[in-house]
Amino acid sequence: MAITKEDILEAVGSLTVMELNDLVKAFEEKFGVSAAAVAVAGPAGAGAAAAEEKTEFDVVLASAGDQKVGVIKVVRAITGLGLKEAKDIVDGAPKTLKEGVSKAEAEDIQKQLEEAGAKVEIK
């Protein structure tokens, strides 16, 4: 019996975030492609205006500090990940936790993580 697209979608839908990450890496290796987003060139002169009015920020966990357990709990609350995935992120710091969030949300996440003992960067 042949595997259908629905079978594949069902199987992919049941994977964890870490398993999906491994799957993407396997596709990249097997087919020699990259899953990285392609940057689109904007109109000339728009770069300076965009740099002045940055509205989207990335929250990066620089290090977990001494209170790793507390940081893992906060990472789980922020990202909605499971315990293992959150622990892997904390252990693998520096890692980007959230991308494209507002300045207020980025500062709130930074405050929560720093209260738990982590070092955080907003980019």
UniProtKB/Swiss-Prot annotation:
HAMAP family registered for this protein in UniProt: Ribosomal_bL12
One Gene Ontology term of the molecular function aspect: structural constituent of ribosome
Which InterPro entries does the UniProt record give? Ribosomal_bL12, Ribosomal_bL12_C, Ribosomal_bL12_C/ClpS-like, Ribosomal_bL12_oligo, Ribosomal_bL12_oligo_N_sf
Q: Which family does it belong to?
A: Belongs to the bacterial ribosomal protein bL12 family.
Record bears the keyword Ribosomal protein: yes
Q: How does it assemble?
A: Homodimer. Part of the ribosomal stalk of the 50S ribosomal subunit. Forms a multimeric L10(L12)X complex, where L10 forms an elongated spine to which 2 to 4 L12 dimers bind in a sequential fashion. Binds GTP-bound translation factors.
Entry keyword annotation includes Ribosomal protein: yes
Gene3D superfamilies the UniProt entry points to? 3.30.1390.10, Single helix bin
Question: What gene is this protein translated from?
Answer: rplL
Keywords assigned by UniProt, alphabetized = Ribonucleoprotein, Ribosomal protein
Xref: NCBIfam families: L12 (TIGR00855)
- Name the job this protein performs: Forms part of the ribosomal stalk which helps the ribosome interact with GTP-bound translation factors. Is thus essential for accurate translation.
Q: What is this protein called?
A: Large ribosomal subunit protein bL12
Q: Name one GO biological process term.
A: translation
Pfam families in the record: Ribosomal_L12 (PF00542), Ribosomal_L12_N (PF16320)
Membrane-crossing residues?
A: none
